Amino acid sequence: MPPATGGGLAESELRPRRGRCGPQAARAAGRDVAAEAVARSPKRPAWGSRRFEAVGWWALLALVTLLSFATRFHRLDEPPHICWDETHFGKMGSYYINRTFFFDVHPPLGKMLIGLAGYLSGYDGTFLFQKPGDKYEHHSYMGMRGFCAFLGSWLVPFAYLTVLDLSKSLSAALLTAALLTFDTGCLTLSQYILLDPILMFFIMAAMLSMVKYNSCADRPFSAPWWFWLSLTGVSLAGALGVKFVGLFIILQVGLNTIADLWYLFGDLSLSLVTVGKHLTARVLCLIVLPLALYTATFAVHFMVLSKSGPGDGFFSSAFQARLSGNNLHNASIPEHLAYGSVITVKNLRMAIGYLHSHRHLYPEGIGARQQQVTTYLHKDYNNLWIIKKHNTNSDPLDPSFPVEFVRHGDIIRLEHKETSRNLHSHYHEAPMTRKHYQVTGYGINGTGDSNDFWRIEVVNRKFGNRIKVLRSRIRFIHLVTGCVLGSSGKVLPKWGWEQLEVTCTPYLKETLNSIWNVEDHINPKLPNISLDVLQPSFPEILLESHMVMIRGNSGLKPKDNEFTSKPWHWPINYQGLRFSGVNDTDFRVYLLGNPVVWWLNLLSIALYLLSGSIIAVAMQRGARLPAEVAGLSQVLLRGGGQVLLGWTLHYFPFFLMGRVLYFHHYFPAMLFSSMLTGILWDTLLRLCAWGLASWPLARGIHVAGILSLLLGTAYSFYLFHPLAYGMVGPLAQDPQSPMAGLRWLDSWDF
């Protein structure tokens, strides 16, 4: 077995020797421990020369890296058609190549890297990525798949090095590497154009870097210490820049940093100036550096996506004015709203659209049978309204009348330009939202009643202020009922042309549903200005993009025929995801974890909680443990505790989320549970060997146990590998299927 054993570690020995970091520290700790163990017990084997140890360490690292790359790149070109979410992220890569603006609920880094990989590998961005099953034909897709597989391949060596540093045991690291190499789920996710391998790459890079800079704690401010601390910050920025799930690894690094600083603060051998330097270094590398890099990804994102595209409508009018090809780009319109102006009014909530009306009436039994008022996502003449004073029908555009600007607090009337009916509300209930009032178009040629009067208010402004196009955020308060004009976002039935419901809500709290801005503005009596002067600043568009992403994330709903899942399903491998194909004639790929690996991980979590609790209670009660048992216990509690914390932080928050969830959300947590399995079983087997030291075969318990786990994991991969690499022919329930007998749960659908 490898020399870095993890056995006999006293508490002080968990810290690497001065002047050594990373693999050097791991090997050195292993040699010192091995020497001490041999002195205590003549039955313990010697592990060979230092040169053999170094060669063995590098050979194992090379082996697990080679196996990881080989499994991830094997049959990477199959199937030659779109699989699962490649339709989204491949399309977004095309948008970057074409510089077309789009909207997504995730930060941009992952998609930018996919687009860059496609561009560098010769993909021209012309494939449509319309739906799963569409063949790539002559389009170059292998560069994007290869990039994702490349990053996914590094998960195994990263986990290997992390466990080696935490446990000082090559066998624990090797077992962890085998679990991830032979997991069909991790393999499947790594072979397609997806964000998951990119996200997991940065998560594992952050975890490894954090563990490495911890191991250099006896050489603070040295070059290796700065390198690993800075690399931790870079990796945190990468994880957050791909998905907001990166917040969980940020939390883990933050908790580790707080504990580290607390320990340093209590070290009376350090001056407060030195503690301050430690604090400053961590602020710079773990806060300032990640924030700067994260912000830079958005700067590049906005710079590259400069053309109008399918994402325009999710953003404010001022944001859209930045995009070439948008009707607001380089446009010139009057800056301040005046009576007589023809305007369009856009709701600030994502994907709600413009205030709209048409000649169709509400049907019988749906409030008053008056003209429908809705919101509509697209540009249309029926979005045009004329703003008038509430108490006069005179034409404000008459040259004899002076220009009068609309101000915050004015009482106004909105007349629909195409039908000459006024925006109107009353105490009739809205068509779809209970306790909200109906909004209609009412009157003839602009003549109606007092239910047509609205007070216009600018959010967070004083009375008398003028109203700016694009920039002013306004609300319309109904004068008679006191309700606020808004859109519920609910889709009307076919009688409403499946447009969105407009209501007047009696709840006056400011929400995006009830806040609007003026977009188009026509008034021949006013001078035009270029909208360039009204474009938002970078901090404003950065903030807006995050608000839109957060709202989009929370509002995600499952698509038709889509397999969603619950968090409790995930650790037990309850149900997978179809990546490709359904019928026996299709090329089928099914995302499912290797059940042997996943159920072993689940058992390991339970065993860790039990054994860790027993050890912690014994140590707290002052039990005198033999040196080797004490050292192994420290490895289990400290190293295992680190990865258990990672599993907890990457798993349990999903129970609190209201959005739709999918099986693949568990895979970052699965990486941590696999590392815990490696540390736990290596430690337990060593403890068993120590406890049975008087038995002649005790020396082989650890070796036999690790080999059994390695061989069992490899054999299970042999059985289940068609799930990842693809299968054609009878389904698993057919006795003729190569997967017959392997459908161990009825919920597995392959």
UniProtKB/Swiss-Prot annotation:
Signal peptide: none annotated. It catalyses: a di-trans,poly-cis-dolichyl beta-D-mannosyl phosphate + L-seryl-[protein] = 3-O-(alpha-D-mannosyl)-L-seryl-[protein] + a di-trans,poly-cis-dolichyl phosphate + H(+); a di-trans,poly-cis-dolichyl beta-D-mannosyl phosphate + L-threonyl-[protein] = 3-O-(alpha-D-mannosyl)-L-threonyl-[protein] + a di-trans,poly-cis-dolichyl phosphate + H(+). It is an enzyme of class 2 (transferase). One of its GO terms (cellular component) is nucleoplasm. Highly expressed in testis; detected at low levels in most tissues. GO terms for molecular function: dolichyl-phosphate-mannose-protein mannosyltransferase activity; mannosyltransferase activity; metal ion binding. It is a multi-pass membrane protein. Residues 1-23 are annotated as: Disordered. Transfers mannosyl residues to the hydroxyl group of serine or threonine residues. Coexpression of both POMT1 and POMT2 is necessary for enzyme activity, expression of either POMT1 or POMT2 alone is insufficient. Essentially dedicated to O-mannosylation of alpha-DAG1 and few other proteins but not of cadherins and protocaherins. This is Protein O-mannosyl-transferase 2. It comes from Homo sapiens (Human). The lineage of its organism: Eukaryota, Metazoa, Chordata, Craniata, Vertebrata. The gene is POMT2.
